């Protein structure tokens, strides 16, 4: 049997990009889809984005680090000692205010790892490492030994992960295939010319009776001005940063001086403290 599987990840709230990817999936005639995590924030999408995901109806959902941060932030559980953590808390507050409570409850149940058997091909699916969905252990330029960690079981043929926002095909030391679909809503690349290409990214893997017969890295154009208009209409926090991302691909998640200025200017730190005081629970985050 022939399977044409759309694999997508790291939407980061970008409704307009995901809608374009979904339309491309339909045009390409995919038979199923797998989602590898990081659905919300910092983009425009909230309940509308969740509703779009229900239309796509992935057979696999994986929980990413930003999914965990949205869940924890919505519960007031991100300690606020750094500007970046205020940023995450304030984004999570915004998502929590706009989605049905069952959305975050459902996300909390998403697994960190799934193993699928497609015909004779055995595939491990994660957001990052099998037991850790954050960090830079699998950045694309790192040694092969790092990627061997994706192959927990000896009988695996293929590992697919996400998180680093780069389309990737490479091999383990045993020449098993490692794939990454890139990012729907927030593509990254240190090479300036490649970073200027801000199309939505995803992957189609075709598997037939003989094995893996196709690996298609897709790039889909969409309207960045339309996404910015949606963000403005949704009154998202940190919209200046989202505008920069839409225009240049730059993100400022770890730009502490800039985040501190915005947190002070718009009262985000005060709002986050008030929100967390209502929940009265503080935990260390991984951000």
Kindly label every feature range from the protein language model.
Residues 7-9, 33-38, 42, 60-65, ...:
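Active-site neighborhood of phospho(di)ester-bond hydrolases with catalytic His/Asp-centered motifs
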Residues 56-114, 141-150:
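Active-site neighborhood of divalent metal-dependent phosphoester bond hydrolases
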